[in-house]
């Protein structure tokens, strides 16, 4: 979703005052993986038109299309293969690992790549090929598991575990996470490299616009229940309607990503990097390159600007309040709102699948609201200050997460059993849930912009080090994701499954984050504030 996804947004590219291209995935920023000092050693490319710059960033839309499907469909789907609700969160551990390991390494290598095709395009091509492979493995995991020895019963009859398919699926899921991280950083850096007279701010806006477009198309695809009707050959003995819909959506993702990739490779003309060139400083004196990677980021804790530790604390609390919903939003719709069960009776399975599709539609609404809200962040911060905007968004998330629990209880008020056994739901409740999804687009826009803008401004007042500060900020995002991935499933299991306990905990974290923000966040100049988008991603 132009969501954070979870880990793995874009790394590099950036520069130019407070304009900073940032991602969740490790060590990004104005330097990491994107144009940093090594960019100075590249011959200046010929200026390109705005239209060509726009087409050069199209690959971001293709990558985000697949990421939107991953966010909306994959947590619910893996439960149909046998993985328990309590264990599904562990599957998402790969995100922060990929962000911390892949992003810095790819950023470093792409900065110094001497290929005749340029520094960024070889990594973009490699990453996209791996993404296509990963989504095919995920989409056909049930069929692969069937061939490897899973039950030979028809999927319309057998609803038990299929462990070969589940293992294949998880491997594909992890490959997809690593592949996304391989593409995002160089793709952002490519836009910064080519921005020229248009400026990094324009390049960042184009990149984020493509990601928003990918989100909208991806969530629309995920909410569609007709792929198995349009392409009936997708259904097999191991793959029924829900699986065939997933398969169809991912096959379209391969086609769309391939189209976006080809256009980017054609229109993004890079000047090859000369590996023996010096790395100049502002004073035109040679300097040793700054450290790159997780260790350099960890060492940076010793040299943080004033106010940055407080930003890290509030950022961590803010993301702790968001990750449960990011991981389980469509699962919540399938279980608590539509009263389905991925391992239950046929009516329960159908109800669960309907809820997941409704959740994907809710994420579509969320992305649309997020896109419009993003344009309002900078004016609001200039008027009342980024601290007020950030704190207010945390309190809104607190209310929204508490509302999910209240809506869940409302949905079950006439049923005296467990979440998984209720089969009916009120249409008004479903409508309220969609409104809630859309409403959350507003604080999500704040989450994707304000913390990074505050970090950029603190670094600027210190006289530099934006890439380092952003890399350190990334740690305050990755650690909460690890905490939620390890703890959300067992926490829900402790209270009797369902998603209500995790959402209740998220509400508490949002409240603490809001209160902490009031007392800890540094005062930032309203007049000098410049909005910075992390551009979604993982």
UniProtKB/Swiss-Prot annotation:
<dbReference type="GO" id="GO:0005886">
    <property type="term" value="C:plasma membrane"/>
</dbReference>
<feature type="topological domain" description="Extracellular">
    <location>
        <begin position="410"/>
        <end position="433"/>
    </location>
</feature>
<feature type="transmembrane region" description="Helical">
    <location>
        <begin position="358"/>
        <end position="378"/>
    </location>
</feature>
<feature type="transmembrane region" description="Helical">
    <location>
        <begin position="199"/>
        <end position="219"/>
    </location>
</feature>
<feature type="transmembrane region" description="Helical">
    <location>
        <begin position="82"/>
        <end position="102"/>
    </location>
</feature>
<keyword id="KW-0769">Symport</keyword>
<feature type="transmembrane region" description="Helical">
    <location>
        <begin position="471"/>
        <end position="491"/>
    </location>
</feature>
<feature type="topological domain" description="Cytoplasmic">
    <location>
        <begin position="103"/>
        <end position="123"/>
    </location>
</feature>
<feature type="transmembrane region" description="Helical">
    <location>
        <begin position="53"/>
        <end position="73"/>
    </location>
</feature>
<dbReference type="GO" id="GO:0009846">
    <property type="term" value="P:pollen germination"/>
</dbReference>
<dbReference type="GO" id="GO:0015768">
    <property type="term" value="P:maltose transport"/>
</dbReference>
<feature type="topological domain" description="Cytoplasmic">
    <location>
        <begin position="1"/>
        <end position="52"/>
    </location>
</feature>
<dbReference type="InterPro" id="IPR005989">
    <property type="entry name" value="Suc_symporter_pln"/>
</dbReference>
<comment type="subunit">
    <text>Homodimer.</text>
</comment>
<dbReference type="GO" id="GO:0016020">
    <property type="term" value="C:membrane"/>
</dbReference>
<dbReference type="InterPro" id="IPR036259">
    <property type="entry name" value="MFS_trans_sf"/>
</dbReference>
<dbReference type="GO" id="GO:0042950">
    <property type="term" value="F:salicin transmembrane transporter activity"/>
</dbReference>
<keyword id="KW-0472">Membrane</keyword>
<dbReference type="GO" id="GO:0008506">
    <property type="term" value="F:sucrose:proton symporter activity"/>
</dbReference>
<dbReference type="GO" id="GO:0005364">
    <property type="term" value="F:maltose:proton symporter activity"/>
</dbReference>
<protein>
    <recommendedName>
        <fullName>Sucrose transport protein SUT1</fullName>
    </recommendedName>
</protein>
<feature type="topological domain" description="Cytoplasmic">
    <location>
        <begin position="521"/>
        <end position="538"/>
    </location>
</feature>
<feature type="transmembrane region" description="Helical">
    <location>
        <begin position="163"/>
        <end position="183"/>
    </location>
</feature>
<feature type="transmembrane region" description="Helical">
    <location>
        <begin position="389"/>
        <end position="409"/>
    </location>
</feature>
<comment type="similarity">
    <text>Belongs to the glycoside-pentoside-hexuronide (GPH) cation symporter transporter (TC 2.A.2.4) family.</text>
</comment>
<feature type="transmembrane region" description="Helical">
    <location>
        <begin position="248"/>
        <end position="268"/>
    </location>
</feature>
<keyword id="KW-1003">Cell membrane</keyword>
<feature type="topological domain" description="Extracellular">
    <location>
        <begin position="74"/>
        <end position="81"/>
    </location>
</feature>
<keyword id="KW-0812">Transmembrane</keyword>
<feature type="topological domain" description="Extracellular">
    <location>
        <begin position="220"/>
        <end position="247"/>
    </location>
</feature>
<feature type="topological domain" description="Extracellular">
    <location>
        <begin position="492"/>
        <end position="499"/>
    </location>
</feature>
<comment type="function">
    <text>Responsible for the transport of sucrose into the cell, with the concomitant uptake of protons (symport system). Can also transport other glucosides such as maltose, salicin, helicin, and alpha-phenylglucoside. Probably required for apoplastic phloem sucrose loading in source tissues (e.g. leaves) in order to transport it to sink tissues (e.g. roots, flowers). Probably not involved in transport of sugars across the symplastic discontinuity between the endosperm and the embryo. Essential for normal pollen germination, but not for pollen maturation or starch accumulation in pollen.</text>
</comment>
<comment type="pathway">
    <text>Glycan biosynthesis; sucrose metabolism.</text>
</comment>
<dbReference type="GO" id="GO:0015770">
    <property type="term" value="P:sucrose transport"/>
</dbReference>
<feature type="transmembrane region" description="Helical">
    <location>
        <begin position="124"/>
        <end position="144"/>
    </location>
</feature>
<keyword id="KW-0813">Transport</keyword>
<dbReference type="Pfam" id="PF13347">
    <property type="entry name" value="MFS_2"/>
</dbReference>
<feature type="transmembrane region" description="Helical">
    <location>
        <begin position="434"/>
        <end position="454"/>
    </location>
</feature>
<feature type="transmembrane region" description="Helical">
    <location>
        <begin position="307"/>
        <end position="327"/>
    </location>
</feature>
<feature type="topological domain" description="Cytoplasmic">
    <location>
        <begin position="455"/>
        <end position="470"/>
    </location>
</feature>
<keyword id="KW-1133">Transmembrane helix</keyword>
<dbReference type="GO" id="GO:0005985">
    <property type="term" value="P:sucrose metabolic process"/>
</dbReference>
């Amino acid at each position: 979703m132009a969501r954070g996804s979870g880990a793995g947004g874009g790394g590099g590219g950036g520069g130019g005052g407070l304009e900073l291209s940032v991602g969740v995935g490790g060590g990004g920023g104005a330097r990491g993986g994107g144009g940093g000092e090594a960019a100075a050693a590249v011959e200046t490319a010929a200026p390109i038109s705005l239209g060509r710059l726009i087409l050069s960033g199209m690959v971001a839309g293709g990558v985000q299309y697949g990421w939107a499907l991953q966010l909306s469909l994959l947590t619910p789907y893996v439960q149909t293969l046998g993985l328990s609700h309590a264990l599904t969160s562990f599957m998402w551990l790969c995100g922060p690992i990929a962000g911390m390991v892949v992003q810095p390494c790819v950023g470093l290598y792409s900065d110094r790549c001497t290929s005749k095709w340029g520094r960024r395009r070889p990594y973009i091509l490699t990453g996209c090929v791996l993404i296509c492979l990963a989504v095919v493995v995920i989409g056909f995991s049930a069929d692969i598991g069937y061939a490897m020895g899973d039950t030979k019963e028809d999927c319309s009859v057998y609803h038990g575990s299929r462990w070969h398919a589940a293992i294949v699926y998880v491997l594909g899921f992890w490959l997809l996470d690593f592949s996304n991280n391989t593409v995002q950083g160089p793709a952002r850096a490519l836009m910064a490299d080519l921005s020229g007279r248009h400026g990094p701010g324009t390049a960042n806006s184009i990149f984020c616009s493509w990601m928003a477009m990918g989100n909208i198309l991806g969530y629309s695809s995920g909410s569609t229940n007709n792929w198995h009707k349009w392409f009936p050959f997708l259904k097999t003995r191991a793959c029924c309607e829900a699986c065939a819909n997933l398969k169809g959506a991912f096959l379209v993702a391969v086609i769309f990503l391939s189209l976006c990739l080809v256009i980017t490779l054609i229109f993004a003309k890079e000047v090859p990097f000369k590996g023996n060139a010096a790395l100049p400083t502002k004073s035109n004196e040679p300097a040793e390159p700054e450290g790159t990677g997780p260790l350099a980021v960890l060492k940076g804790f010793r040299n943080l600007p004033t106010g940055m530790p407080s930003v890290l604390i509030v950022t961590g609390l803010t993301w702790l309040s968001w990750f449960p919903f990011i991981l389980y939003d469509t699962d919540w719709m399938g279980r608590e709102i539509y009263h389905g069960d991925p391992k239950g009776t046929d009516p329960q399975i159908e109800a669960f699948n309907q809820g997941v599709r409704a959740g994907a539609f809710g994420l579509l609404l969320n992305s649309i609201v997020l896109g419009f809200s993003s344009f309002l962040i900078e004016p609001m911060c200039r008027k009342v200050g980024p601290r007020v905007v950030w704190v207010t968004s945390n309190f809104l998330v607190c209310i929204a997460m508490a509302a999910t629990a209240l809506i869940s209880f409302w949905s079950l008020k006439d049923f005296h059993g467990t979440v998984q056994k209720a089969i009916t739901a009120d249409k008004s409740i479903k409508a309220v849930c969609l409104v809630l999804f859309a409403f959350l687009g507003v604080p999500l826009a704040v989450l994707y912009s304000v913390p990074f803008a505050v970090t950029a401004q603190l670094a600027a007042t210190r006289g530099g080090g934006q890439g380092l500060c952003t890399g350190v900020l990334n740690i305050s995002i990755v650690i909460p994701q690890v905490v939620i991935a390890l703890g959300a499933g067992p926490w829900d299991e402790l209270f009797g499954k369902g998603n209500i306990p995790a959402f209740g905990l998220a509400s508490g974290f949002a409240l603490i984050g809001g209160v902490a923000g009031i007392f800890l966040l540094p005062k930032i100049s309203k007049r000098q504030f410049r909005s910075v988008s992390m551009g979604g991603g993982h």
